[in-house]
UniProtKB/Swiss-Prot annotation:
Gene3D superfamilies per the UniProt record, alphabetical: NAD(P)-binding Rossmann-like Domain
Residues that, per the record, bind UDP-alpha-D-glucuronate: 149-150, 177, 185, 188, 191-192, 245, 248-249
Compartment(s) of residence: Golgi apparatus, Golgi stack membrane
Catalytic activity, reaction form: UDP-alpha-D-glucuronate + H(+) = UDP-alpha-D-xylose + CO2
Pathway where it operates: Nucleotide-sugar biosynthesis; UDP-alpha-D-xylose biosynthesis; UDP-alpha-D-xylose from UDP-alpha-D-glucuronate: step 1/1
Provenance organism: Mus musculus (Mouse)
GO function terms (MF aspect): NAD+ binding; protein homodimerization activity; UDP-glucuronate decarboxylase activity
Primary location: Golgi
Entry protein name: UDP-glucuronic acid decarboxylase 1
InterPro entries noted in UniProt: NAD(P)-bd_dom, NAD(P)-bd_dom_sf, UXS-like, UXS1_N
């Protein structure tokens, strides 16, 4: 056992080392300032610049750094409800630094729960959740769900998976592993700790539907070997595993079949129709429409989806539930709408139709309305204006040479991404 005297000695040595390091740092800083001062005197003598303006050039960046440091020590978080220990849940969100996951993180944190975000940052970004870092209810873990995770939680929102065509076609094997092995690991965790698991499934399980609109009892029309099969079939297997664990192991599961969703924090280059059209319109490039543009989609704003996910998790509904906006638009109508909202003079360019592109997609949400009391409330134009504002700021950051991580490029032919 270490004696108190030895501990005091170690502490004293550490303090001396700290003082020495501080002294070295202060000396280096003083030397730098003196060098600049001498240089300024020389400049003044040569009549090139007054010493006062040079001092201001040096001091102002220092003031900025001090302000940044003060902000980091006095970080203000979004308002958080206080929940009693009985009501406060320990919640795990896989893929929680991604587009949808980060918005879900915001809601659950502000509702007063303890949230652990797990992400491998393949498509997720730390900047999406950095405003929570340091909060006592928040934890961020860099982890890939294809490896087991050991943690005590009450609820698991399993969102981890690439969701845009370029990302999951870039690495189809990884996509399959995330949706199968990753789901298996999360179900195993739910079984061990008695947690309820919500699987973020997708409308892609319906494939190119022969039934319109699509209700939860429709089995789908999917190409199992097509370019998108890694995602479509991966989610279908994930659903099957959820219900196998529910029947055999008694794990509580919830399955959300998510339709097209958009909003801030989408990757600008993720290859989906909303981000494609907004980015092209803002940059004055042609809006690329694949095929005739008569294909239909239904778009929901991200906050509506998040509310639906939370409602489903806390419900008694164990069968799959569609979460989407039943307001249907053709791709061509949607392109024209974004052009008008941006105020862009971009032309609309028609390209050859992509393989396996669904001709129609529209959710039947009667079940969500009846059993969850949920339906989308954000009007399409209101949501699009928010997304356009976000994309505009992202482009400004890039123009100012501020680093914005981008997803890895897909190894697919240009112009062949579907209207996801």
């Amino acid at each position: 056992m270490v004696s108190k005297g030895l501990l005091r000695l170690v502490s004293s040595v550490n303090r001396r080392r700290m003082k020495l390091l501080l002294g070295i740092a202060l000396f280096a800083y003083a030397a730098s300032v003196w060098g600049n001062f001498v240089n300024m005197r020389s400049i003044q003598e040569n009549g090139e610049l007054k010493i006062e303006s040079k001092i201001e050039e040096i001091v102002e960046p220092l003031r900025e750094k001090i302000r940044d440091l003060e902000k980091s020590f006095t970080q203000k978080y979004p308002p958080v409800k206080f929940l009693s220990e009985k009501d406060r849940k320990r919640i795990l969100i896989t893929g929680g630094a991604g587009f949808v996951g980060s918005h879900l993180t915001d809601k659950l944190m502000m509702d007063g729960h303890e949230v652990t975000v797990v992400d491998n940052f393949f498509t997720g970004r730390k900047r999406n959740v950095e405003h929570w870092i340091g909060h006592e209810n928040f934890e961020l873990i860099n982890h890939d769900v294809v490896e087991p995770l050991y943690i005590e939680v009450d609820q698991i929102y399993h969102l981890a998976s690439p969701a845009s065509p370029p990302n999951y076609m870039y690495n189809p094997i990884k996509t399959l592993k995330t949706n199968t092995i990753g789901t298996l690991n999360m179900l195993g965790l739910a079984k061990r700790v008695g947690a309820r698991l919500l699987l973020a499934s997708t409308s892609e399980v319906y494939g190119d539907p022969e039934v319109h609109p699509q209700s939860e009892d429709y089995w789908g029309h999917v190409n199992p070997i097509g370019p998108r099969a890694c995602y479509d079939e991966g989610k279908r297997v994930a659903e099957t595993m959820c219900y196998a664990y529910m029947k055999q192991e008694g794990v509580e599961v919830r399955v959300a079949r998510i339709f097209n969703t958009f909003g801030p924090r989408m990757h600008m280059n993720d290859g989906r129709v909303v981000s494609n059209f907004i980015l092209q319109a803002l940059q004055g490039e042609p809006l690329t429409v694949y095929g005739s543009g008569s294909q239909t989609r239904a778009f929901q704003y991200v906050s509506d989806l998040v509310n639906g996910l939370v409602a489903l998790m806390n419900s008694n509904v164990s069968s799959p539930v569609n979460l989407g906006n039943p307001e249907e638009h053709t791709i061509l109508e949607f392109a024209q709408l974004i052009k008008n909202l941006v105020g862009s003079g971009s032309e609309i360019q028609f390209l050859s139709e992509a393989q396996d592109d669904p001709q129609k997609r529209k959710p039947d949400i009667k079940k969500a309305k009846l059993m969850l009391g949920w339906e989308p409330v954000v009007p399409l134009e209101e949501g699009l204006n928010k997304a356009i504002h976000y994309f505009r700021k992202e482009l400004e950051y890039q123009a100012n040479n501020q680093y914005i991580p981008k997803p890895k490029p897909a190894r697919v032919k240009k112009g062949r991404t579907r209207h996801s």
